[in-house]
């Protein structure tokens, strides 16, 4: 054979080799859809860069190919592999700081930048070896496949084989899991479980595509082809204590991933957010009390989607301006839910279908709550409540912090300072008030045996968390050395119920405030320290306050019924809330009230949340709004911040403005720390008192409307305190607003948040908005308006087309619930409006589920308002409509008819076009009509 023939054969062999390489890297099994690189499509990058992998030579010239056979067969220039824009780099050294040689030893690209912060210097090339996906095989709920690695990654204890399950959960929810098929790793099991179903594949709102080698997947919105998730942009890593998954984002408008001290829209400029529950007063760049691995994305055209990673281990989320996001978890599995919406409210509803709809709070819990660490005796506590009553400040619930407890031990009360605590509680009850006290999880372990039954009984019943040697782990909290109940143990939940029952038989509290339940400890891990192990010193620790996972909490090697604390830490508050809610339900046989500091997805089913130890300053006042709105997205509608602040001394002006804003938190409580100046409303000057009193009366007048919103949250997963973007998804201006918010779809709240301000620029989305105070209309095309805001005013506007039920306020909800109702009717340009009222006894369990409630629809049109009671149970029988205001009546009416009878008491203001009808007494349990005749 001649030289030419040899050359021809060589060329043909090379061509076949190259074609084989291209085929293997660009096509899928017969079950999977063929795709190119969505990353390349989105960023206009040459496609051939995704076909091969050719590791760079390290600086020390020692070649360490990860896939040598691939680099030999498909040798394409490394330059294009690393030619990646800085904002689109994905960090190859997240687990540790790497030198250039260490970076290149991993097969990654190294390209320093002038600034030390921001894009990584060590980053993945366009194609990086990882898992290879086998054929997709149908399963009862979708399809599954096996993922294998040809060679290990750079991580210790790499898992070489994974099981992928693609689950078509519902038409609007895609569920994907990645697990180790050879080992039972910890998986989160939410109390009450997660619903399981299978969607009709013909009607789903999404399509899925898989890249087989290296593995990645893409989720698209079926209606427009938009990429919702694309994980082909960076490698999947799955080791025993390090799980990493990256994805592009459909837009830069991202919210969620709490609990953090942030704006509502997250900063995507190389921001790192750690999800690891910690006793930490809110401040920037800190992991706080709760962990919620859920985010919602506002897409450019007003559509929205959400993503939930069901994982309770320590998680770090890296946001970058690509826009893109990287999940890094220290354990568990990858259990992803993608919610297709298509609108923001639907995304939240779909999310709550997985984690559970929120509980229905008792009506009284929507009133004003007052607390302070420093009410040191029952007499002091009595005087506070009496002074509030004497000064005509509405208040429903008096609280006590740990001052009540004997030697700061829970389930006791101090015999000297709080010896008549039971009598005081009964006095409050006779006045129509409620009483709540704090209940920390830590149980004192140093009392003389036989003198403190919670610990003695807990020892006998084996309910406490153990250390690595099997002994009770002892931490340190307020009473000193303490043991911690293991709420994942059913025996512990029964013991907890017994402790609450015994205490409740002496002190009939109406609810419980569960604090310090991250869980918090004043020593690192335990009083004896923690063992040196992979759990205490994992290969990778996210950026946590204190630098270690056991900082300010328990040892990670601590043993609980379900797993190690390493896996369960973020669930502690949720499991305690579940146990406390269940106990109160059985003991009181009424709707439980629980308030928790620590949180995790699903806690809204059992508890409300407050935002922790906020400082008394204007910045914290401002940031309280996005904090409250975040919890609305997380399925926790009963949420609020400590009005006037907890830490530091408030000022009169700050406290007035905070009480005005707090009047529109779904949960309103004034609470502060004992070293600080008192901040009860009555301690301030007369002008400030009048402003605070006005805010409280306004809140109490709106409680029927607020209660109805909570019903819709409980029954339909609607939000109560609502970001503007959820109601106006097609309005670009609404996307960024987090200094204003809505109650439901009807009320727009625009508080003063700056010191010394007497006016504010408020954004009014496209609509006609009426001032709640005087009915003045504002016709907005979606613009900012400068509104007067003197110290006695909070601007609240009613949206056209809505009817707001109100009730004459009183000093307690016990009294106000018997008062006449009133309606605010905000007419649209076409003269119509609609509203509703949910009403029951305010405290019985499952009234909606048991059909034991009243529900009334109000409609306005053709110059009349009509009520239509769709369901009645007697709760409204003695209540009447006392009057109504109609906003937007174009001209003065000649007369008013109520159920066909003329009404004499009415007024009309030509300047604001407001009709006010008074002196009515129309039964709320019957159909009524109020008509204005021109």
Where does each model-flagged region fall?
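Accessory, solvent-exposed terminal regions and/or long lumenal/extracellular loops of proteins
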Residues: 278-283, 793, 798-901, 918-925, ...
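Short, well-ordered beta-strand segments enriched in hydrophobic/aromatic residues
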Residues: 145-147, 166, 176-178, 205, ...
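N-terminal signal-anchor transmembrane helix specifying type II single-pass membrane topology
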Residues: 2-33
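Catalytic-domain carbohydrate-binding cleft regions of carbohydrate-active enzymes
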Residues: 3-13, 40, 44, 48-55, ...
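Extracellular Cys-Trp
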Residues: 94, 107-124
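Extracellular/luminal ectodomains and secreted, surface-exposed scaffolds of diverse proteins
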Residues: 110-115, 899-923
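Surface-exposed beta-strand/loop patches in extracellular or lumenal glycoproteins
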Residues: 180-182, 188, 192, 756-765, ...
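A low-complexity, Ser/Thr/Gly/Pro-enriched, surface-exposed linker/loop concept
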Residues: 129-145, 158-203
């Amino acid at each position: 054979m001649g030289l030419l023939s040899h050359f021809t054969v060589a060329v043909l062999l090379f061509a076949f080799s190259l074609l084989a390489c291209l085929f293997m890297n660009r096509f899928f099994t017969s079950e999977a859809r063929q795709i190119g690189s969505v990353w390349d499509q989105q960023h206009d990058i040459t496609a051939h860069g995704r076909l091969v992998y050719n590791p760079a030579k390290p600086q020390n010239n020692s070649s360490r190919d990860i896939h040598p056979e691939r680099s030999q067969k498909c040798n394409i220039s490394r330059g294009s592999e690393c030619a990646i824009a800085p904002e689109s780099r994905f960090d190859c050294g997240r687990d540790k700081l790497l030198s250039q040689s260490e970076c290149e030893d991993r097969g990654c690209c190294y390209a320093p930048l002038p600034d030390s912060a921001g894009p990584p210097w060590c980053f993945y090339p366009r194609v990086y070896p990882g898992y290879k996906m086998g054929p997709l095989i149908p399963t009862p709920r979708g399809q599954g496949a096996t993922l294998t690695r040809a060679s290990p990654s750079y991580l210790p204890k790499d898992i070489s084989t994974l099981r992928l399950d693609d689950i078509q959960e519902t038409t609007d929810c895609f569920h994907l899991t990645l697990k180790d098929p050879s080992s039972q790793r910890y998986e989160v099991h939410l109390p009450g479980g997660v619903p399981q179903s299978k969607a009709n594949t013909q009607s789903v709102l999404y399509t899925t595509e898989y890249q087989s080698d290296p593995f990645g997947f893409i989720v698209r919105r079926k209606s427009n082809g938009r990429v919702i998730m694309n994980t082909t942009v960076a490698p999947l890593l799955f080791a025993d204590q390090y799980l990493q998954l990256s994805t592009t984002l459909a837009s830069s408008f991202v919210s969620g991933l709490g609990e953090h001290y942030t704006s509502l829209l997250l900063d995507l400029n190389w921001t790192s957010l750690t999800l690891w529950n910690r006793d930490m007063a809110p401040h920037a760049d800190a992991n706080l009390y709760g962990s919620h691995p859920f985010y919602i994305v506002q897409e450019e055209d007003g559509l929205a989607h959400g993503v939930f990673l069901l994982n309770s281990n320590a998680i770090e989320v890296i946001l970058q301006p690509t826009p893109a996001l990287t999940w890094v978890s220290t354990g568990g599995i990858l259990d992803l839910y993608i919610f297709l919406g298509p609108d923001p409210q639907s995304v939240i509803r779909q999310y709550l279908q997985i984690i559970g709809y929120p509980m229905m709070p008792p009506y009284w819990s929507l009133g004003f709550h007052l607390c302070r660490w420093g009410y040191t005796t029952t007499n002091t506590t009595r005087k506070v409540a009496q002074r509030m009553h004497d000064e005509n400040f509405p208040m429903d619930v008096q609280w006590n912090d740990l001052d009540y407890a004997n030697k700061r031990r829970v389930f006791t009360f101090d015999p000297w300072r709080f010896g008549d605590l039971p009598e005081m509680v009964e006095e409050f009850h006779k006045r129509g008030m409620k009483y709540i006290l704090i209940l920390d999880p830590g149980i004192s372990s140093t009392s003389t045996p036989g003198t403190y039954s919670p610990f003695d009984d807990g020892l006998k019943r084996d309910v406490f968390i153990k250390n690595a040697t099997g002994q009770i782990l002892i931490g340190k909290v307020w009473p000193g050395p303490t043991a911690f109940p293991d709420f994942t143990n059913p025996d512990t939940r029964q013991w907890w119920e017994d402790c609450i029952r015994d205490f409740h038989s002496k002190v009939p509290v109406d609810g419980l405030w569960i604090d310090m339940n991250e869980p918090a400890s004043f020593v690192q891990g335990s009083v004896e320290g923690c063992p040196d192990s992979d759990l205490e010193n994992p290969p990778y620790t996210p950026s946590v306050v204190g630098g270690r996972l056991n900082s300010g909490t328990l040892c990670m090697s601590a043993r609980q019924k379900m797993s190690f604390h390493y896996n369960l830490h973020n669930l502690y508050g949720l499991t305690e809330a579940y146990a406390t809610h269940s106990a109160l339900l059985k003991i009181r046989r009424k709707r439980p009230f629980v308030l928790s500091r620590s949180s995790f997805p699903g806690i809204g089913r059992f508890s409300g949340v407050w935002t922790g130890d906020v400082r008394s300053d204007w910045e914290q006042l401002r940031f309280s709004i996005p904090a409250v709105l975040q919890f609305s997205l997380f399925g926790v509608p009963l949420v609020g911040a400590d009005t006037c602040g907890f830490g530091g001394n408030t000022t009169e002006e700050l406290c007035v403005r905070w009480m005005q804003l707090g009047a529109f938190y779904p949960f309103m409580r004034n609470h502060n720390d004992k070293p600080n100046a008192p901040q009860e409303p009555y301690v301030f000057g007369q002008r400030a008192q009048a402003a605070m009193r006005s805010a409280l009366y306004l809140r109490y007048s709106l409680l029927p409307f607020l209660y109805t919103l909570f019903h819709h949250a409980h029954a339909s997963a609607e939000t109560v305190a609502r970001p503007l973007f959820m109601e106006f998804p097609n309005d670009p201006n609404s996307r960024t607003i987090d200094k204003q918010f809505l109650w439901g779809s009807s009320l727009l709240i625009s508080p003063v948040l700056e010191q010394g301000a007497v006016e504010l620029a408020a954004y009014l989305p496209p609509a006609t908005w009426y001032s709640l105070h005087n009915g003045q209309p504002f016709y907005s095309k979606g613009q900012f308006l400068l509104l007067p805001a003197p110290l006695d005013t909070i601007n609240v506007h009613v949206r056209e087309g809505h009817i707001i039920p109100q009730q004459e306020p009183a000093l307690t909800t016990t009294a106000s619930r018997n008062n006449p109702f009133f309606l605010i009717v905000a007419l649209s340009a076409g003269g119509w409006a609609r509203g509703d009222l949910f009403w029951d006894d305010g405290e019985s369990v499952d009234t909606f589920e048991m059909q034991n409630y009243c529900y009334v629809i109000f409609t306005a049109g053709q110059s009349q308002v009509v009520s239509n009671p769709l369901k009645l149970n007697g709760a409204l029988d003695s209540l009447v409509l006392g009057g109504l205001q109609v906003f937007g009546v174009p001209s003065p009416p000649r007369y008013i008819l109520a159920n066909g009878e003329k009404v004499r008491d009415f007024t009309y203001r030509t300047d604001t076009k407001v009709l006010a009808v008074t002196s009515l007494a129309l039964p709320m349990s019957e159909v009524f009509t109020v008509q204005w005749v021109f």
